[in-house]
Curated annotation (Swiss-Prot):
This is GTP-binding nuclear protein Ran. The record marks Q69 as: Essential for GTP hydrolysis. GTPase involved in nucleocytoplasmic transport, participating both to the import and the export from the nucleus of proteins and RNAs. Switches between a cytoplasmic GDP- and a nuclear GTP-bound state by nucleotide exchange and GTP hydrolysis. Nuclear import receptors such as importin beta bind their substrates only in the absence of GTP-bound RAN and release them upon direct interaction with GTP-bound RAN, while export receptors behave in the opposite way. GO terms for molecular function: GTP binding; GTPase activity; metal ion binding. Its cofactor is Mg(2+). GO terms for cellular component: cell cortex; cytoplasm; mitotic spindle microtubule; NLS-dependent protein nuclear import complex; nuclear envelope; nucleus. Residues 7-171 form the Small GTPase Ran-type domain. Keywords: Cell cycle, Cell division, Cytoplasm, Cytoskeleton, GTP-binding, Magnesium, Metal-binding, Mitosis, Nucleotide-binding, Nucleus, Protein transport, Transport. Gene3D superfamilies: P-loop containing nucleotide triphosphate hydrolases. It comes from Drosophila melanogaster (Fruit fly). GO terms for biological process: cell division; establishment of mitotic spindle orientation; intracellular protein transport; meiotic spindle organization; nuclear export; nuclear pore complex assembly; positive regulation of protein-containing complex disassembly; protein export from nucleus.
């Protein structure tokens, strides 16, 4: 199985969301990607090559991280151009970061059009959750995939990448055969809490969408 070179299928993955939602923490969990990251000075971004091993061979996501530029307004189109997939992240302890998800989605699809997108609610290890599962409906309206994640505990780290890999390769049965080397968890997910948030999410997904036509 190839480790280096251009023979690994490689996809540009754009990582967006408000500042402070944990995007950089998330992408830095993957140890080899952090070690091999490249800085693109013209755009002020870090590109992390995240390799995953699947039952069809290795796959690489070149994950573009904004390095905090989003705090100064929108991102330049060069960040999005040739993006083949995307992760939009918000912080479940901050309602405003979820309210801004439609803006990030709009910017993404304006440049990238019809690419697979995963919405991630980060920091679910924190019990003081402000954005409840039942409030998270944007992905259902726009046909995106959604995952609760906790970057600091590694909870569901691989899920967004597995979903994107299946879409990009066109194989719904694609599986990761080994987990990448991740940094040790900084926090532990409480097992009862984890079971609770998984139940809440299942219930929310089974609930009909509200009739009103508002974005959120």
């Amino acid at each position: 199985m190839a480790q280096e070179g251009q023979d690994i299928p490689t996809f540009k993955c754009v990582l967006v969301g408000d500042g402070g939602t944990g995007k950089t923490t998330f992408v830095k969990r993957h140890m080899t990607g952090e070690f091999e990251k490249k800085y693109v000075a013209t755009l002020g971004v870090e590109v992390h090559p995240l390799i995953f091993h699947t039952n069809r061979g290795a796959i690489r996501f070149n994950v573009w991280d904004t390095a905090g530029q989003e705090k100064f307004g929108g991102l330049r189109d060069g960040y999005y151009i040739q993006g083949q997939c995307a992760v939009i992240m918000f912080d479940v302890t901050s309602r405003v970061t979820y309210k801004n998800v439609p803006n990030w989605h709009r910017d993404l699809v304006r440049v990238c059009e019809n690419i697979p997108i995963v919405l991630c609610g980060n920091k679910v290890d924190i019990k003081d959750r402000k954005v409840k599962a039942k409030s998270i409906v944007f992905h259902r309206k726009k046909n995106l995939q959604y995952y609760d994640i906790s970057a600091k505990s590694n909870y569901n780290f691989e899920k967004p990448f597995l979903w994107l890999a299946r879409k990009l390769v066109g194989d719904p049965n694609l599986e990761f055969v080994a987990m990448p080397a991740l940094l040790p968890p900084e926090v532990k997910m409480d097992k009862d809490w984890q079971a609770q948030i998984e139940r809440d999410l299942q219930e929310a997904q089974a609930t009909a969408l509200p009739d009103e036509d508002e974005e959120l």
